[in-house]
A protein has these predicted regions:
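Second-shell residues forming the walls of enzyme active-site clefts
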Residues: 49-144
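Enzymes and membrane/adaptor proteins characterized by extended Gly/Ser/Thr/Asp/Glu-rich
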Residues: 1-49, 78-90, 116-129
Length: 144
């Protein structure tokens, strides 16, 4: 059986086109209980697998001179609503989120990150993560 290095092909194509950054990897956990909008863009529902594969992908990109943008901080796996069309609202406790969806973002580092356009009611009830100073500051201070 022939194995194809898809990651390598993408890196070569990006470099050929003069692109030096890619919005990967998706660190969101797959949640089979939801009609998860992240779907197969997630590596797994298991955070250890997501962390391991994400670190490998980031290392490969950096070794090739490309930068990565981890996404969707602090996590998009716990909602079934596509944030491109409506504002998802999550009512889960901060403790639950820290031990599940937010966990991968604490273990994987990248210079750049894309926030999740989600309202986490138990963290900041008035602003979605993209606009929440509290959530962004918490991420910067490694509270997630």
């Amino acid at each position: 059986m022939c194995e194809i290095d898809v990651k390598g092909i993408i890196i070569v194509l990006l470099k050929y086109c003069g692109i030096n950054i890619n919005t990967v990897p998706v660190l969101d956990l797959f949640n089979a209980d939801k009609k998860n909008v992240i779907g197969n863009r997630s590596f797994s529902k298991n955070y250890k697998i997501v962390v391991k594969l994400s670190k490998y992908l980031i290392k490969s990109y950096k070794k090739s001179g490309l930068e990565t943008v981890i996404k969707h901080i602090p996590g998009h796996g716990c909602t079934s609503i596509d944030s491109h069309f409506a504002l998802p609202q999550v009512n889960l406790s901060l403790d639950y989120l820290k031990n599940n969806d937010f966990r991968t973002f604490k273990k994987v580092n990248s210079y750049l990150a894309m926030t999740a356009h989600i309202l986490y009611k138990n963290i900041d009830p008035t602003r979605c993560a993209t606009q929440s100073k509290k959530i962004i500051k918490d991420k910067q201070n490694n509270l997630f």
